[in-house]
Structure formats: C-alpha cells, structure tokens
Curated annotation (Swiss-Prot):
This is Cytochrome P450 711A1. It is found in: Membrane. Disruption phenotype: Increased shoot branching. Accumulation of 3-hydroxycarlactone (3-HO-CL), 4-hydroxycarlactone (4-HO-CL) and 16-hydroxycarlactone (16-HO-CL) but not of their expected corresponding metabolites hydroxycarlactonoate (HO-CLAs). Expressed in the vascular cylinder (including the pericycle) in roots, the cambial region of vascular bundles in inflorescence stems and the vascular junctions of axillary regions in leaves and flowers.
C-alpha cells in the first residue's frame, strides 16, 4: 500500500501540468477579453447602450434596421457609441457636430474608416472613396478637374438618348413595371458610356446580347450586393465585424473552398478586376484623342502629369473607374425609384410637378444645363425631399488621424467617427413632421428652409470628402424625371409592399424593388 509521500510523487507532475493548463487558459482568456474590449475602453466615456459580448449592438440593427441610429439618438443624444461587433463607432447625429467633423476639423479626420466588407475587396478599397491621405488628395484633384460644367453639359445629349431609349416600351397599355430594375439598367448604361465609353446595351430598344457584357454586369451586381453591414454577408465579413483579426486568415482559407460565399466573392472580384484591366489596357493602347469618357480623360491626365502617373497605376485606374460605375448606377437608380414611388402616392405633389414641367415648353424640347439648374425649382424640391425621405447613404465614415475632441469627448487616434446623415434628415428640429413627404419644405423662400441648419441635409456628404459626382447625378436624375413626367404618370402597384422594405449595406437598396403602374398621359 502506497504511503502519502508516494501518492504525492505520483500526483505532483499531474498537478503541475494541470496548473500550467489553467494558467495558459487564464492567460488566453485575458488576452481574448483585452482584444475584444480594448477598443471600446478607449471611448467608454461616450454614452451608449450596453453592448452584448462579441456581437456588440448588431442585434439592435437587426431589430430596428436603418432606424436604429434615430432610436439611439433620441435616447443618448447627438453623440453616442455604437458597437459594430468588436469595433466601436462614435455616431454623430447633430448638424453642427457634422460640420465640425467634416469641415472644421477635417485635417484631424481626413480619411474614411474601412469596414470589413471593403477591407476584403481591393477592387473597392483602391477607389477614391476609401483611398487615404496624400494618394486620395492627388486622385481627388485630378478627378475633380474632369467634372467641369462644360463637360457635364456635353453629356446631356448622351444622357437624353439613353433615357428615351430605355423608356420606349412604356408606350403600351398600362402595366406594372419594376422601376428599380429599369433604373438600374438605365443608370448603368449612362455611366458605362460616361465612364468607360462602352454601351452596355441593357436598357435600349434591343438590348445587346453580348455574353462578355452580360457577364460583366452580373459580376458587378453580385459584387455590389455582397457589401453587407450586418450578419448576412460572407463568413469572413462576419468575422471582420466580430473578430477582425480572424477575417483575413479565414478569407484566405475560405476563398479556396468551392461553394462558399467567400469563394464566390473572390471569384467575382477577380473576374471583375480582370475585365476592368482589359478595358483599361485596350483603351490605353487605342489612345483616342477625341474620346471624352472618364477613363480616357484619366489616361490622358496620367500621361501628361508625372504625379498622376505615379498615382493612377493600372490597378487604381480600374478601381476608380469601377467605383464610378457603382456610385453612378445603384445610388442614382435608388433616388429615381424613390421619387416615382413617393410622388405616385401624393397626387397634390404630382399635380404641381406636372404643371411646372408642362410649362417649360414642347415635350420634345431638350433642356440645357442652365434650364435644369434654374427652370425647375419645384422639381428640385421634390428630388431633395425624396433624398431626405430615403437617404441612400445614411452614414458617412471618418477616422481620427490623431487625438481630437469632438462634442466635448476626447477621442484617441484611430477612432471610427460616423456621421448619421439619415438621423439628421429625420430630425423634427430641422424637418417638422419628418415622416411626411413635403417637397415645399425645401422652398428657398419658405420659413422652414430659412431656419434650417445649413448642414441638416447633406445627402452627398460633407467637406472635401463629399461626392465628386453629385452634379453629374443630379443632371441625370432631372433629365430622367422630366422625360418620364412629360409622357406618363405612375401609381402604386397592388403587388408592391407598402411601406417599402430596405436592405442595409454600404448603400441602401429596396429589398423587393419598386413596382409601379405606368399610365400614358397623352
């Protein structure tokens, strides 16, 4: 029979190993806790709801959708903390604070923070939108020079041609049409011509049945729809939201496993990049001196400017050109769909709008750029109110480049600061009865417009990082609406849901489309 000393000799190595395992597990748990919660500790002085472990406040987003920030702003005030998984966001929901972040302290917050859907996609990451620091500044200066008023004016005939071609089939008997799809095809065709010098042929009388073109557009649509900001994206994107350190290792593994969403996204982005590179290479060899599309102008700028040559390498040219395709199609189509949906439900607005449009002149008269800017004040109000009602980009991302004070809170370097433009647009202090569609609230002679904070409505962003293509987009929107309302009126389809459901991603989209009944006026 073993003595007590002998038993201790037997158990001692086991206890030592057991203690070592406990120590290791304890250390690992501490490291994990520090990793998961350290970002939020640095901004714990900013008010906000209690975050759930790992997922943060994502369940609130699932519950409230895009309205989650309005709900939290009412509870916590104009500046509050929101946890996107592990990553804390400082949400700015007040117009003056937005001006402070976007303009007054722009040098302290010059870059956009890069969320996990973008960090996994070089094609999106290398565009103007997410490029950073000096490269962004040089890219922006070159691109801005391409958006001169004279160039935009020269695009009116091209835009008008695509618009009339896309709507030719509306002349038949009244029928229901999914306008969100029609507008996406139309805006893709217009920006394809303006950005690439390519006619995709999606919206014409006889759509081009080109396999390469169709494949390119399908890849474009799929790539865009995967930019999710919730837990419905690929596994690597979900991990990027919850545990960012695991995103890239898992993406590298999953993109090699056929059938996974990461594999499909990787394959799609690779094909898109390859197709874009072919377009860029072909256009560079052609060197057409008379071509005025965006890609040709960028290539010319690269050849004439040594600085531009270093900035606009082939991969960045492909990314910027593709970015124009995305920004110039999905967002514009969303706004056009919003206008038709809202106006068709407000006959008093429709009546006044038709009176203004009919008063311009003959239905075949193509408006000039000056006409578009000065002859349609009520149309301007309708567009603004639709953009307020359905803000296509309800959040604008920034990141602190150094320690900075915002709204009385000291934020460390690297803090993600997001401007809640969607909250501003529904704030009753600036927009009384915000849930009502009232275009006259944007009447420059009205009291509401006069007393509103100048940065309460900023649908194209704010400061130097604002959308460079906003004049292009507004010109396209006005031309399209003028042509449509000169010839048709619209009514809600009985098959369409009311209210419309939204998909929440990098930009908003209508989950099930906008379906309307088309009625010819004459």
């Amino acid at each position: 029979m073993k003595t007590q000393h002998q038993w201790w000799e037997v158990l001692d190595p086991f206890l030592t190993q057991h203690e070592a395992l406990i120590a290791f597990l304890t250390f690992a748990a501490v490291v994990i806790v520090i990793y998961l919660y350290r970002p939020s500790w640095s901004v714990c002085n900013v008010p906000g709801p209690t975050a759930m472990p790992l997922v943060g406040h994502l369940p609130l987003m699932a519950k409230y959708g895009p309205d989650v920030f309005s709900v939290l702003a009412k509870q916590y005030g104009p500046i509050f903390r929101f946890q996107m998984g592990r990553q804390p966001l400082i949400i700015i929901a007040e117009a003056e604070l937005c001006r402070e972040v976007g303009i007054k302290k722009f040098k302290d917050l010059p870059n956009r923070s890069i969320p996990s859907p973008i960090s996994a996609s070089p094609l999106h990451k290398k565009g103007l939108f997410f490029t950073r620091d000096k490269r962004w500044s040089k890219m922006r200066n070159t691109i801005l020079s391409l958006y001169q008023p004279s160039h935009l004016t020269s695009l009116i005939p091209t835009m008008h041609s695509f618009i009339t071609s896309a709507t030719h089939n509306l002349d038949s008997k009244p029928r229901d049409i999914v306008f969100s799809n029609l507008f996406l095809k139309l805006t893709t065709d217009i920006i394809g011509q303006a950005a690439f010098g390519v006619d995709f042929g999606l919206s014409g009388k006889k759509p081009i049945k080109d396999v390469e073109v169709t494949d390119f557009i399908n890849q474009h649509v799929y790539s865009t729809t995967q930019l999710k900001m919730d837990l419905s994206g690929s596994l690597s994107i979900i991990l990027g939201l919850l545990i960012p350190i695991l995103q890239e290792p898992f993406r590298q593994v999953l993109k090699r496993i056929p059938g996974t969403m990461d594999w499909r996204v990787e394959k799609t982005n690779a094909r898109l990049s390859g197709q874009l590179n072919e377009i860029v290479s072909k256009r560079a060899k052609e060197a057409e001196t008379d071509s005025k599309d965006f890609l040709s102008l960028i290539l010319k700028a690269r050849e004439s400017d040594p600085f531009a040559k270093n900035i606009f390498t082939s991969d960045y040219i492909s990314a910027v050109t593709y970015e124009h395709l995305l920004a110039g199609s999905a967002t514009t189509a969303f706004t056009l769909s919003s206008v038709l949906y809202l106006v068709s439900g407000h006959l008093d607005v429709e009546k006044r709008l038709l009176q203004e449009i009919d008063g311009f002149g003959n239905r075949d008269l193509i408006p000039t750029a000056h006409d578009l800017q000065h002859k349609f004040p009520y149309l301007d109000q309708v567009i603004k109110e639709a953009m307020r009602f359905y803000m296509v980009s309800p959040l604008v991302a920034r990141e602190t480049a150094k320690e900075v004070e915002i709204g009385g809170y000291l934020l460390p370097k690297g803090t993600w600061v997001w401007l809640a433009l969607g909250v501003l647009a529904k704030d009753p202090k600036n927009f009384p009865e915000p849930e009502k569609f009232k275009p006259e609230r944007f009447d420059p002679n009205g009291e509401e417009e006069k007393h509103r904070h100048p940065y309460a409505f900023i649908p194209f962003g704010i400061g130097p990082r604002a959308c460079v293509g906003q004049r292009f987009a507004l010109q396209e929107i006005k031309l399209t609406l003028l042509h449509l309302y000169r010839n048709y009126i619209f009514r809600h389809s009985l098959e369409m849901e009311i209210p419309l459901q939204l998909d929440y991603g990098i930009i908003l989209s209508f989950k099930n489309g906008v379906k309307l009944r088309t009625i010819k006026r004459f």
